[in-house]
Regions:
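Catalytic NTP-binding/metal-coordinating core of nucleotidyl cyclase/transferase enzymes
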Residues: 1-42
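A short, aromatic/hydrophobic, helix- or strand-capping loop or linear motif
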Residues: 10, 51-59, 116, 202-220
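Catalytic beta-strand-to-alpha-helix segment of the class III nucleotidyl cyclase homology domain
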Residues: 29-140
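C-terminal tail/extension regions appended to the core domain(s) of diverse proteins
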Residues: 128-181, 188-191
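Hydrophobic ligand-binding cavity/cleft-lining segments
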Residues: 167-218, 335-342
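Glycine-rich portal/gate segments that line the openings of hydrophobic small-molecule binding cavities
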Residues: 204-205, 214-264, 272, 312-316, ...
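Short, solvent-exposed aromatic-acidic interface loops
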Residues: 256-261, 281-288
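A conserved amphipathic terminal alpha-helix motif
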Residues: 283-341
Length: 342
């Protein structure tokens, strides 16, 4: 549970622990489709890596440890209204939609699909996310609940996403292929910094001098590998293409920069205390004309601009974190292995 909660937060806020399940939520205006999908998949990937580590580190043959390979996670996502109320001194979420998201846990998905690891999204959640579920290879599903009726849903296969994660070729700038490095500390955890650096609306808040960021996503409407951005600065524009996308860890972009031409860079996100160590690596410039431009003034202009942007970003993140409600502490497991996953 500790691994799961750490991966879900701070994108999602813990409402309550319910046995071996965690009830989490986020206001609609605080999260978009890409962040929700990246957070869910990232949580599942962290869970699978944790299971691998436990299997490799233990020789215990007790029943709990023997059953570790059978553990899995399921996610249930719904979009709706809720009210906050205090019950026995504790704040809880209530309402018809809160009841529905709990009812989703009783379903026939395993029987219908044989999937053991999945994320289940109601049709209302998919509509709010503004994605094309078919293009994202989700499966249509339907359940009927007493006093609620038929509920249309979409199933996202997390086992397939894990397989893709393991097989997908990484594209990143290695240290020995780096032209220059820019590093800074930002006062927020990686998921928050990631959102500010990848959401076009949030980029406009700190990229001073940018008139607009036009984003085109691959089929399905989700940010990731293949996404292109047109960052318009007066008469010029920087055209970006995402080559690799590892949420909250790093992304790699090929960009065409006015006055410099095509460049490739990777930005790494590393947790340090309550903040994020950000490292920008620019790929070596091997074109002679580009190198002349770089040493002739483009380097100072480019890195100076990035430095000013990151200063503004730090100001925004400081205000963002100060405005957030304090998170309850993550419970620390007393055992080396989780008991269940839902």
């Amino acid at each position: 549970m500790e691994t799961v909660l750490k991966a879900l937060r701070p994108t999602l806020r813990l409402a309550k622990l319910e046995g071996d399940a965690a009830f989490v939520f986020a206001p609609t205006e605080k999260i978009d489709a890409s962040m929700l999908l990246d957070t869910i998949e990232g949580c599942y990937f962290a869970f699978r890596r944790r299971l691998q580590n436990i299997r490799q580190a233990t020789t215990c043959m007790c029943n709990a440890c023997v059953l570790i390979p059978n553990l899995n996670l399921k996610f249930f996502a719904h979009h709706g209204a809720f009210v906050r109320q205090r019950i026995a001194g504790r704040e809880e979420l209530a309402g018809t939609d809160v009841i529905l998201v709990h009812r989703l846990m009783k379903n026939s998905v395993a029987e219908a699909t044989r999937l053991q690891a999945y994320a289940l999204f109601t049709a209302s959640c998919v509509a709010a996310m503004r994605i094309d579920p078919s293009a994202l290879e989700m499966r249509e599903h339907q359940e009927t609940y007493e006093h609620i009726g038929e509920v249309a849903m979409w199933i996202h296969d997390l086992e397939a996403r894990w397989k893709h994660e393991l097989e997908h070729r990484r594209v990143l700038i290695e240290v020995n292929d780096t032209e220059t490095v820019l590093e800074t500390m930002l006062p927020a955890p990686p998921p928050v910094v990631w959102e500010y650096m990848t959401d076009p609306a949030k980029r406009m808040q700190w990229q001073v001098g940018t008139d607009r960021v036009d984003q085109a996503n691959p089929a399905g409407g989700r940010r990731g590998t293949g996404t292109t951005n047109h960052c318009v600065h007066g008469p010029g524009a920087i055209v970006e293409e995402i080559l690799d996308w590892r949420p909250f860890e790093y992304f790699t972009i090929r960009a065409t920069v006015p006055g410099l031409g095509p460049t490739t860079y990777t930005i790494f996100f590393t947790t340090e205390g309550a903040g994020t160590h950000l490292q920008f690596r620019l790929k070596k410039l091997k074109n002679r004309e580009q190198r002349d431009l770089w040493t002739g003034g483009a380097r100072e202009q480019w890195l100076g601009g990035l430095g000013r942007w990151f200063e503004r970003l730090a100001e925004l993140l400081t205000a963002e974190m100060a405005a957030r409600e304090p998170e309850p502490p993550v419970p620390v497991s007393r055992h080396s292995a989780p008991s269940h996953g839902h």
